[in-house]
């Protein structure tokens, strides 16, 4: 497959400049079966997910690059269509992904009819919306596991709504890990000039510190390596952030670097991986942005998320790594405060679609 760049974008390999509204076109045959099939979940019905899905799929280039299958509720999408200036939008409702038309101007939809609008008020947490959002992810995951779709791209769900519905997951990654039986997973963030993998994510800071163990750090270094390979980066250069200020300063400010992190680094090096010593957290991300490293292993959620949000608030992508399926997502939440206003931007979802397609291409697969 020949790639032609148009504008700045995230491409396979080390170049990571991305402008999601100037997505490059892919030279391919006219045969629609040459396009990867992506399952795109609608997200929480009460949030901005339905709006950004519809906005993203207004870009004709998306259909030239892939076959997007939306998993959601037609009633919610029709409600959102009026907010984003697309009243009367056509829906191609299917029961089987193989039956979809996947043409620009019509939304190919697997209609789960599980989100009655009256039970999913816009901008509000509800058990009905939380349950529906989880069911979209379950169905998309099952399709990917069965090989019926090439990858899963998720719009945001709301953790409070999800838990109110009885699903005690910290987020998409944990949900998908259980659904697929994946033993070791982590979160990869991909942004305009930075990639970050986390040792821990949605836990209290005290618990995050306890989770900085040699075994876990070594596992995440391995996940960082394989995630870069999945993005087409050969021989990735991996930076490892320290936990403490100045990476412990030789034990003056904490000993986790010498006791847990450095042994994990040495073990990874012994297996041929290109991994740095524990680096001062306040400078390692800048060095990665300047091109010295391909990915940074962050020790906890905010250590990795703060630089990513600063650099890529609208265009960051969340990738679940360690799963037997490809899953990417927007790097923002349900934004209840603007849901229903039509203001939500689709940039991050376009970026998530782009990264999913890169991973499918690197993996060399396409659904039927």
Located regions from the model:
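Contiguous, glycine/small-aliphatic-enriched amphipathic segments in soluble metabolic enzymes
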Residues: 15-172, 215-299, 303-328, 332-334, ...
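Extreme N-terminal basic, low-complexity initiation segments
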Residues: 2-10
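Glycine/threonine-rich beta-strand-loop-alpha-helix active-site module
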Residues: 164-186
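Short, flexible loop segments at boundaries between secondary-structure elements
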Residues: 179-194, 323-337
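Ligand-binding beta-strand-loop-alpha-helix segment within the catalytic cores
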Residues: 189-211, 215-218
């Amino acid at each position: 497959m020949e790639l032609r760049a148009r504008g700045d974008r995230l491409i396979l390999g080390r170049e990571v400049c991305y402008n999601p509204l100037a997505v490059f076109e892919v030279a391919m045959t006219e045969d629609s079966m040459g396009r990867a099939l992506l399952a795109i979940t609608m997200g929480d019905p009460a949030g901005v997910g339905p709006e950004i899905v519809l906005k993203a799929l207004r870009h004709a280039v998306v259909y030239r690059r892939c076959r997007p299958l939306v998993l959601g509720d037609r009633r919610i999408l029709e409600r959102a269509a009026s907010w984003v200036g697309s009243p009367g939008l056509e829906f191609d409702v299917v029961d089987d992904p193989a039956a979809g038309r996947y043409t620009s101007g019509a939304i190919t939809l697997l209609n789960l009819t599980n989100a009655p609008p009256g039970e999913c008020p816009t901008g509000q947490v509800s058990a009905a919306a939380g349950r529906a959002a989880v069911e979209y992810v379950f169905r998309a995951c099952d399709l990917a596991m069965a090989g019926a779709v090439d990858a899963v791209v998720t719009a945001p769900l709301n953790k409070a709504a999800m838990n109110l519905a009885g699903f005690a997951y910290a987020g998409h990654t944990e949900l998908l890990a259980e659904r697929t039986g994946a033993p070791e997973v982590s979160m990869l963030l991909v942004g305009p000039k930075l990639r970050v993998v986390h040792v821990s994510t949605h836990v209290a800071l005290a618990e995050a510190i306890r989770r900085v163990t040699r075994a876990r750090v070594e596992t995440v270094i391995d996940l960082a390596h394989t995630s870069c390979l999945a993005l087409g980066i050969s021989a990735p250069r991996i930076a490892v952030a320290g936990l403490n200020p100045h990476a412990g300063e030789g034990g003056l400010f904490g000993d986790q670097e010498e006791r847990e992190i450095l042994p994990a680094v040495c073990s990874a090096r012994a297996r041929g991986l290109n991994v740095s010593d524990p680096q001062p957290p306040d400078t390692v991300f800048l060095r990665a942005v300047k091109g010295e490293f391909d990915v940074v292993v962050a020790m906890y959620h905010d250590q990795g998320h703060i630089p990513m949000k600063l650099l890529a608030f609208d265009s960051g992508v969340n990738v679940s790594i360690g799963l037997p399926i490809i899953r990417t997502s927007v790097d923002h939440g349900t934004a209840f405060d603007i849901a229903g206003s039509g203001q939500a931007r689709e940039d991050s979802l376009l970026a998530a679609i782009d990264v999913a397609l890169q991973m499918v291409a690197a993996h060399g697969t396409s659904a039927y």
